[in-house]
Amino acid sequence: MNRILAVIFLSLFTFIPAIAEPLYAGIQIDNDSAGVLFGYPINRTYAIEAHYSKSNSRTEHAGVTVDTSSTGIGIVGIAAFPMKLNDVLPYSLFVKGGYQRTTNTDTCSIPTSATLTVPYDNTITSHKNQVIFGGGAELDLAKNLTGRLGLDFLGNKRSLNLAAIFKF
């Protein structure tokens, strides 16, 4: 029994890195949110990437408070164009396009002093399905570490983002 378990664990330690080799994962921050991304490079030029982002904001005015929580989950296709200049680390320019589903939850709180009756609390949740596209540059900082600077367009919103990506 112990030998069988040893063989299973040894197989897992050799199999998992083999299937994870082309994958990459990273963290991304932009103007008002933070998130994670996971990708699969199809070849040197093309990749498929999934991402998840979350942001929270709070607005207060005249006793009225609105808390907004947004989450986005999406998938994009990426086309990268490797570049090389003299005396500069290798980098790539990329364009991307895809789909994102965004969920916004707004919680409004109005105190008794503003309503002159009882306090008012309400939560509204909305969903949007939107096209996302953008572009930017990636710089290989180390063998398995890449830095990314990009500009994304989601609906009528633009966001400048910065990401650190680890390639397995």
Where are these regions (language model features)?
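Transmembrane beta-strand segments that form the barrel wall of outer-membrane beta-barrel proteins
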Residues: 21-32, 48-50, 93-97, 144-155
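Gram-negative (and chloroplast) outer-membrane scaffold detector with strong preference
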Residues: 35, 39-110, 163-168
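Solvent-exposed loop/turn segments connecting transmembrane beta-strands
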Residues: 26-36, 87, 127-131, 150-163
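Predominantly the C-terminal beta-signal and adjacent terminal strand-loop region
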Residues: 56-57, 140-168
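Cleavable N-terminal export/targeting peptides
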Residues: 1-22
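Solvent-exposed loop segments that connect transmembrane elements
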Residues: 106-125
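Catalytic phosphate/metal-binding cores of nucleic-acid and nucleotide-processing enzymes, i.e., regions
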Residues: 133, 137
